């Protein structure tokens, strides 16, 4: 198992993004307040750090690092569909469910979204309630709000 920490830009709700990988790709991304483990890097974590730096510098709006999330077949379908939500836009859970084949999938889509182990890279923050309200985000609604504002306003918060 490999671990790497990314220092987030000033004003971001958490000081670090913790990246976890195995030999096949990134398996986890979460937002943390402190460094809890000694870093042990590999090519996947280093590529992820590079892409996060580019994202926060306004040079990247999607990620190409190799991902290897653990989940059910349906969860993985949802997570890959999340990658189709354009940068700077939001979809409702219903829109995401329809894109997956049925509006009846809303609850299942919400559950899969909540279990996304690679937050930000798999952009589950771009999913909102049908009424436009921010709902559910494993990293916290403060982070979800920050990311949506950052993407909507043209990367005006560059690390610099």
Q: Predicted segment positions?
A:
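Basic nucleic-acid-binding alpha-helical/helix-turn surface characteristic of O6-alkylguanine DNA
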Residues: 1-104, 150, 154-160
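Short clusters of hydrophobic/aromatic residues that line enzyme substrate/ligand-binding pockets
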Residues: 63-67, 109, 134-137
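Gly/Ser/Thr-rich beta-alpha loop segments that engage phosphate groups in nucleotides
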Residues: 73, 90, 103, 112, ...
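Conserved SAM-binding loop
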Residues: 98, 120, 136
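Regulatory, non-catalytic segments
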Residues: 107-116
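Short Lys/Arg-enriched helix C-cap and helix-to-coil transition segments
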Residues: 120-127
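…primarily DNA-binding HTH/wHTH and HhH modules…
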Residues: 130-160
């Amino acid at each position: 198992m490999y671990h790497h920490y990314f220092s987030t830009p000033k004003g971001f709700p958490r000081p670090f993004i913790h990246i976890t990988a195995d030999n096949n790709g990134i398996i986890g991304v979460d937002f943390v307040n402190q460094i809890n483990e000694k870093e042990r890097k590999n090519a996947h974590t280093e590529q992820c750090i590079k892409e996060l730096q580019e994202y926060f510098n306004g040079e990247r709006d999607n990620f190409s690092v190799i991902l290897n999330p653990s989940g059910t077949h349906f969860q993985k379908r949802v997570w890959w569909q999340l990658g189709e939500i354009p940068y700077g836009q939001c979809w409702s859970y219903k829109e995401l469910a329809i894109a997956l084949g049925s509006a009846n999938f809303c609850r299942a889509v919400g559950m899969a979204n909540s279990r996304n182990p690679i937050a930000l890279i798999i952009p589950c923050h771009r999913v909102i309630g049908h009424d436009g309200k921010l709902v559910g985000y494993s990293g916290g609604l403060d982070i979800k709000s920050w990311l949506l504002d950052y993407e909507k306003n043209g990367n005006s918060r560059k690390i610099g």
